[in-house]
A protein has these predicted regions:
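Short acidic/histidine-rich active-site segments
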Residues: 223, 249-271
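Extended, charged catalytic domains and RNA/DNA-binding interfaces, predominantly
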Residues: 1-218, 226, 243-246, 253, ...
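Soluble non-cytosolic domains of exported or imported proteins
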Residues: 24, 236, 268-272
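Conserved active-site loop/cleft motifs that coordinate metal ions or position small ligands
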Residues: 42, 220, 254-257, 292-295
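A short, acidic, flexible beta-alpha connecting loop/helix-capping segment that sits on the rim
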Residues: 46-48, 262, 295-301
Length: 308
């Protein structure tokens, strides 16, 4: 069964190491993704928040790398820009690649930059990484209670108008609830877990999970070890998060978001390991329909509802 993976940091790693997506030294490449049953992949553009011009240059280098890899590996990949791309028969044996921006420092406060990145192929965006920027507070700002700025609210409206998926991973708790108020389409939290099972700031509280469900959203359960369990995280611990969240808000709101190449410590070592997810979910009592929803159906629903 094909899988949608909602987050990997492979593009920035490829640029840093001057490596290829076909095969490389990281946690994710085409050869292993095919073994791992990946059908659709969100590829993050990410640069550590620094000088705005430095960030923009680095993000644009990653956009260029994305297009190079799509062109050089056209037998295996296609650029996913609309839902229809995901279901075309000629794409059935390829990986659909959706371009995502992790942290909007490259956008700044210029609304035209949102439209420009859309023209460059961007279809998903998180307003922040961990830090505060001109649009919102990130999760590392602690108890500042800072949410969205006025410009952040305007950016959300522009994203909705264009058809760009909103990702609320990394945003502050106040920003999370602000975003649900000002973005009028279903949202994603592309890589996070349940804070009730692992008390990490990047994980979602029960109230956040319930709010996500009320807005028709989807969370990508992630296998970064420190988000799964304080120490000694295993596959069973990862599956515990799936079970907890589906029990709390329903199976229709759960997917997977690996964060491959974003952390050295993973429950699943590399993307090949995704091949065990279907069987693992079955072992926890999920039926075939529910497994398909978790592995691809829920994420594809958001893509269908948001992308134009």
């Amino acid at each position: 069964m094909k899988i949608v993976d909602l987050h990997c940091d492979t593009l920035s790693a490829l640029v840093d190491k001057n490596e290829s997506l076909l095969t490389n030294s990281g946690q994710y490449d085409i050869n292993r993704a095919r073994q791992g049953h990946i059908g659709w992949q969100f590829f993050a553009l990410f640069a550590m928040p620094k000088d705005a011009h430095w960030v923009l240059r680095n993000i644009l280098k990653q956009v260029d790398k994305f297009y190079d890899e799509i062109e050089n590996n056209a037998a295996y990949l296609y650029h996913l820009k609309r839902y229809q791309d995901a279901i075309k028969p000629e794409n059935s044996n390829k990986i659909g690649c959706l371009l995502h921006l992790e942290g909007a420092e490259a956008i700044g406060t210029d609304l035209e930059m949102v439209s420009l990145f859309y023209r460059l192929g961007l279809r998903s965006m998180a307003l922040t990484w961990n830090n505060r920027n001109q649009l919102a507070d990130g999760i590392s700002e602690g108890d500042s209670n800072g949410g969205l700025s006025l410009k952040g609210r305007q950016v959300l409206k522009e994203m909705s108008r264009l058809g760009i998926i909103l990702d609320l991973a990394h945003i502050s708790e106040a920003g999370y609830y602000d975003a649900l108020q000002y973005y009028d389409k279903p949202i994603m939290v592309t890589h996070a877990n349940a804070r009730k099972l692992c008390n990490h700031r990047r994980n979602l509280t029960d109230d956040q999970l319930k709010a996500l469900a009320q807005h028709g959203g989807v969370i990508g359960i992630t296998q970064v070890s420190e988000f799964v369990k304080e120490s000694g995280a295993t596959l069973n611990d990862l599956l515990d998060h799936v079970v907890y969240v589906t029990d709390l808000i329903g199976v229709e709101h759960v997917a997977f978001g690996s964060d491959f190449d974003g952390s050295d410590s993973m429950v699943i070592d590399d993307v090949r390991g995704y091949s065990i997810l279907s069987e693992s979910l079955q072992s926890r009592g999920y039926n075939n329909r529910e497994i398909e929803m978790i592995l691809n159906g829920n994420a594809l629903r958001i893509i269908k509802e948001v992308l134009k």
